């Protein structure tokens, strides 16, 4: 492979590493001053110990940085192959829609926030489908696939939250609705997990729903909560099992290997 193209690829991957760093950073910032994971705090920042209003600005800044580095990755990757450019572009569009959703939430336009998070979910799904058509190596899984699927799960939860503003009757069953919706997500991911052996999406979804069903929800709606916890575990453990079986099929290649250089 041409050295210039190889250099562009490494630059793009390094940009996406920065995206992961920002994503992890913003999650950690939400836990400042909190020892126990609070229920639905990913969906509802007002439940965080960190200032909700300040969190909106921090999240917006991080998403803008994500967009910049993802767009840079798409630009670098366009010289390598159009299919990879498409993945990075879809990731960029999803991040932009997510940013618009938080912005509309900040100014009180709940309907526009709902539309924005719906669009973010759409672009996330397209990114995941595009990735599923490719062979996997650990670089692609860790740098591209995991951030996309983390954003997808978060956007689905935000989509559920803002759907209540579009369907006023759901406000009367706020708690039950969220719990039931999480179970539906679990069921869908479980089906996709068996169908595509997508251990990354299965594990992240199962773990997120497991964490979101802690605390007061268990005492408020014990039957639905425990059912969610059970289905979460039924997703997490098969995900690990599938990973153990499929691990040998992944190409654990280094940057210096010729096969890695010719991967895309």
From Swiss-Prot:
What's any GO biological process attached to this entry? Answer: meiotic cell cycle
Membrane association type = Multi-pass membrane protein
Q: Which keywords does UniProt give here?
A: Endoplasmic reticulum, Meiosis, Membrane, Transmembrane, Transmembrane helix
Highest taxon of the source? Eukaryota
- Respond yes or no to whether keyword Transmembrane helix is given for this record: yes
The primary site where this protein sits is: endoplasmic reticulum
Q: Which GO terms describe its cellular component?
A: endoplasmic reticulum; endoplasmic reticulum membrane
Q: Where in the cell is it found?
A: Endoplasmic reticulum membrane
Which portions of this protein are annotated as coiled-coil regions? none
- Segments spanning the bilayer are 18-38, 54-74, 84-104, 140-160, 174-194, 199-219, 223-243
Function (record text): Has a role in meiosis.
> What is the protein name given in its UniProt record?
Meiotically up-regulated gene 162 protein
What is the source species?
Answer: Schizosaccharomyces pombe (strain 972 / ATCC 24843)
The gene name reads: mug162
């Amino acid at each position: 492979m041409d050295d210039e193209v190889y250099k562009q690829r490494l630059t793009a991957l390094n940009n996406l590493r920065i995206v992961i760093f920002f994503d992890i950073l913003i999650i950690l910032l939400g836990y400042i001053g909190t020892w126990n994971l609070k229920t639905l705090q990913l969906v509802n920042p007002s439940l965080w110990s960190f200032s909700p209003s300040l969190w909106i600005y921090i999240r917006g800044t991080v998403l803008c940085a994500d967009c910049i580095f993802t767009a840079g990755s798409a630009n670098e990757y366009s010289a390598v192959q159009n299919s990879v450019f498409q993945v990075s572009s879809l990731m960029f569009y999803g991040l932009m829609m997510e940013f618009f959703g938080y912005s509309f939430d900040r100014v009180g336009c709940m309907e526009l926030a709902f539309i924005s998070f719906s669009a973010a979910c759409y672009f996330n799904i397209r990114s995941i489908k595009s990735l599923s058509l490719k062979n996997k190596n650990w670089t692609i899984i860790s740098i591209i696939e995991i951030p996309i699927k983390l954003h997808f799960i978060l956007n689905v939860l935000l989509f559920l939250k803002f759907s209540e503003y579009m369907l006023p009757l759901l406000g009367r069953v706020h708690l039950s609705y969220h719990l039931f919706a999480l179970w539906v997500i679990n069921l869908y991911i479980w089906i996709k997990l068996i169908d595509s052996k997508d251990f990354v999406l299965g594990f992240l979804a199962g773990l997120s729903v497991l964490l979101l069903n802690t605390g007061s929800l268990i005492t408020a709606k014990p039957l639905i909560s425990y059912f969610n916890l059970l289905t979460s575990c039924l997703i997490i453990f098969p995900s690990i099992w599938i990973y153990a079986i499929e691990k040998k099929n992944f190409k654990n290649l280094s940057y210096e290997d010729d096969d890695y250089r010719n991967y895309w």
